[in-house]
Structures are given as structure tokens and as C-alpha cells.
């Protein structure tokens, strides 16, 4: 299980923590810690434990799996439209597309349509009465998803695996 841990700068990305039982920890997302004055004080990182020396494929699966989950979470709950939080689950994306497509095909005759935004504790309902407003919402939602995916792909492509490979080959 991945967990956020705090430690010293220069922490090893792969470490055998118990040679007798062949326990290894793999670490990633190393970030500096700052106090209230902005002074750096150690680092935080994610780590997971293996009961064997991990392979490079296992390291990549672990780190990329976390990155994919982070991207999915950003898509799911990070979009805000007109000050309202929009939940972009797969089901909601389908519903937004279906409503948009039908409105375009009927030149707006299928409107109005109401969507629930916000969250469980503070829902907000918005009525789309004009095709232009629905199109604006839908296009911005799709642009947000595409931007998050592009940013995620760039982060994964920029990942430097050489330190992991070096530590695994020691």
C-alpha cells in the first residue's frame, strides 16, 4: 500500500530495509517540505513495500499506476465551471455528451436540460436553456479532460528511471 512518508533529503529511491526477509521499499514523488517561513526541512515522498527485490517492471507499474490514479482523480473532481464543482465521472461524461449531441441535432429543441453539480453535501443545479451555453460547458469540460491527460502523459514521459535501474543493478 502506498503511503506518504517524511524523511531526509537524498533518500534512496529503492532501499533494502530488511536483508534477512528481503524487504524492499520503493519511493517516488519526492517533494521538499517547507515550514511556515518557507524554509526547506526534509522531504516527503510516497513509498510502497515489497517482500522481494522488485523488478524494473514492478517499479514502473507501481509509480505509473499511482500517476494514472492521480490523473484520474484530477479529471474526476478538479473541473470547475462558473464557480461550480463538476464531477466528471465516466457516467456523467456520457450524460453530458448525450445531452450536448441531442441539443446539437435538434438545434436546441431538446433543451432545457438540468445537471446537478457541486458535491453530495452542497449540490447545485443548473438549467441549460440555450445551446450556446451547453456547448460552452461541454467544450470546456472536454478541454479540461484533454489538458489533464496531456499533462499526465508529459509527466510520465519525463519520468527518469535511471536511478531506479542503477539501484536495482547494485
Regions found by a protein language model. Give the residues of each.
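A preference for well-ordered globular domain cores
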Residues: 2-170
Amino acid at each position: 500500500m502506498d503511503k506518504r512518508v517524511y524523511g531526509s533529503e537524498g533518500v534512496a529511491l529503492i532501499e533494502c530495509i530488511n536483508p534477512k526477509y528481503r524487504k524492499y521499499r520503493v519511493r517516488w514523488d519526492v517533494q521538499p517540505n517547507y515550514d511556515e517561513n518557507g524554509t526547506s526541512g526534509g522531504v516527503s515522498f510516497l513509498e510502497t513495500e515489497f517482500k522481494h527485490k522488485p523488478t524494473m517492471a514492478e517499479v514502473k507499474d507501481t509509480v505509473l499506476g499511482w500517476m494514472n490514479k492521480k490523473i484520474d482523480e484530477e479529471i474526476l473532481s478538479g473541473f470547475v465551471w462558473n464557480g461550480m464543482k463538476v464531477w466528471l465521472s465516466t457516467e456523467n461524461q456520457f450524460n453530458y455528451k448525450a445531452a450536448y449531441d441531442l441539443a446539437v441535432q435538434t438545434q436546441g429543441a431538446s433543451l432545457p436540460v438540468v445537471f446537478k453539480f457541486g458535491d453530495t453535501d452542497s449540490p447545485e443545479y443548473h438549467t441549460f436553456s440555450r445551446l450556446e451555453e451547453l456547448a460552452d460547458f461541454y467544450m470546456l469540460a472536454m478541454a479540461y479532460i484533454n489538458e489533464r491527460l496531456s499533462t499526465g502523459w508529459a509527466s510520465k514521459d519525463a519520468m527518469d528511471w535511471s536511478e531506479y535501474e542503477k539501484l536495482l543493478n547494485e
